[in-house]
Structure formats: C-alpha cells, structure tokens
C-alpha cells in the first residue's frame, strides 16, 4: 500500500510516540480511505467491527453510498479487558450473504480481531470480502486498504475526552501527552 497523497495539518508537529487525531483529520482519513477503496473495489455493504471500528465504517459506508452493518468482537467489556483473546460478541450480519463486503476496523495491529471477523463474515458466504482500517502499523497485519500507516499510539477523537464522574475530562490514558 502507498501512503496517502494528502497532507494532514499539524501532523509533523506532534510527538512521535502519539498521534492525536482531531475530528477534521479523522474525516479526511475516512475520505481518503473511501477513495482508495472506490478506485479498486465496489462493495455492496460495509461491516464495522464494534466498538471503535463502527465509527470509520459508518462514515466510509456513507461516502460510498452503501448499507452499513456491524458486528462486535472484543477483548473488553466496557473499558476493562476481560479476555486474553478477542471474542465474537455479536455475529456477522446475514445480509452479507451473496454480497461484496468491506470489513472495517479503526486500526490493524496484530490483525487478530480482523482475522476473526473475516472468518465470521466468510461463514455467511459473501461473494467477496476485503478489509480496511483507518490506521495500520508498519509491521504486522496489513488490511487490503488503510488510510495512514503509523507506529504511534493513536488518540482517536472519540476517545480523547471521556465521561467520568459526571463530566467530560481528558482521558487519563492520554493526559500526560495532551496539552489540556
């Protein structure tokens, strides 16, 4: 895969270990991802992997003007990791049968979640299924399509501030690197 041909404002000024993604940058990445997919593949529907993968999946589906569905695969319940390996918590949509499917997650690291989702979607018997993520790592699993390659810890706009004790606060995981 080639890296995106668009410039991301503010990207070069960020700490190398973290990539703080504001909503406008996320939108640009989704548009770039949708364009990359559309140049090579015409999915009939998009399946997003909950929880975070449904966000780029819904945006990409909207841009591509196709139906959107979700499935849930996770190691977590809420914000707490409760499993060593990801588990399928809601099945692949049966609407994928006989269709060209684009399977979307927010990031590909080890690829374990995407591989599990890919197998589950294939069990529904689509015509074809391809994978896409907003971000991919330089090493490890590569989806068929991704918007940006980085080894930085990605701070997604929906995870930057969280609801805690009755108010929105900077996510404690990122407080030391965010200027707020």
Regions found by a protein language model. Give the residues of each.
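Active-site-facing substrate-recognition patch
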Residues: 1-43
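Conserved glycine-rich SAM-binding loop
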Residues: 52, 109, 113
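A structural signal for isolated positions on well-ordered beta-strands in alpha/beta enzyme cores
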Residues: 45, 69, 102, 130-132
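Glycine-rich phosphate-binding loop signature in dinucleotide/nucleotide-binding domains
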Residues: 39-42, 95-97, 124-125
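Conserved PRPP/pyrophosphate-binding segment of the phosphoribosyltransferase/PRPP-pathway fold
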Residues: 28-79
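Short, glycine/charge-rich flexible loops or terminal/linker lids adjacent to PRPP-binding catalytic cores
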Residues: 62-102, 112-119
